[in-house]
Amino acid sequence: MYRTYKKFKKPGILLREKYSLVGVSRREGSGYSRLSADFELSKRWQTQNGLIIRGTGNVLTAAYLENNSTTRGYLLKVYPLGALELKYPLFRGKNERSEVLMPIAQIVYSTDTSSTTNPIDEDSSTTEFDSTTLFKLRKIPGIDRQEKGLRLNAGLQYFYEHKNNYKYT
């Protein structure tokens, strides 16, 4: 797997790239090879009153070559995704401590542009959903299946820090 992160000269713009090559073979049945690429471009703004806005565009692609003893097949999957995230940090500091309460709202839309409804399904297709994945754009860890449609994620983050390096999140 190969990953890169690139910040542009304009502040707040970030490009992320990730590539991987996977090959699966079996004694019985068919095997396949997969080449995938994941591109993400995001831009962050902050308004004068402290509202943090982040827009994100992402395209995940996967090209499959099925290696069967009798046939050979090709499949291309493309998963475009767009997201808008709003955060509004509320800060309170007093003497030796500081607290931040941050409401977060995220709206995400994704779709599957491939023509087939029977993808090769070798990766985990179970959605990982807990407090650490709530604001992840893709909650299914594998590439074979992705969430589709419009969804809204909302929550709160709380940070507490004491002068003596005591932190609570």
Regions found by a protein language model. Name each.
Residues 1-169:
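Outer-membrane beta-barrel translocator/pore domains, especially the C-terminal barrels
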